Amino acid sequence: GQCRIAPLHSCLVADDTMSAIAQRLASLGITLPSVAAPAAAYVPFVRTGNLVFVSGHIAKRDGKPWVGQLGLTMGTEEGQAAARAIAIDLLGTLQAAAGDLAKVRRIVKVMSLVNSTPTFTEQHLVTNGCSQLLVEVFGPEVGSHARSAFGVAQIPLGACVEIELIAEVQ
């Protein structure tokens, strides 16, 4: 089905036929959120040509920043859960940018910042929480992507993880 939305709102399927992506989201029990209002002087995404640059999204739990530092107050599994939660928020923003997730041709790149101690070395495993969900939703040909994962000393609002992405759309 064709997904028509107004910016900053969640997706509403326009007919009885769900797209394969909408079906995957439903089977995973995922409802995409509305685009969150920026916390500073930036926009949630920029579309130029066929590329969409989605601004960094921080991990949230119960609507508040998911605060913590990997290697001190959080372990890898909790970090992965935070990264997966971010992926859901990123998908909501990407849907607003593209008009329909079925228009996504490729997740090009994911960049992850992990609030971690100097001795924590599993940023790549934390980021898998996001990467794996993108592949689950889009399949390996569209969802697999280039990626960077960095350990950083701090993230805005004390969040444990921040992730941004670049996607190619129709």
List each language-model region with its residue ranges.
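Short, polar/acidic, helix-capping and beta-turn segments at strand->helix junctions
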Residues: 17-170
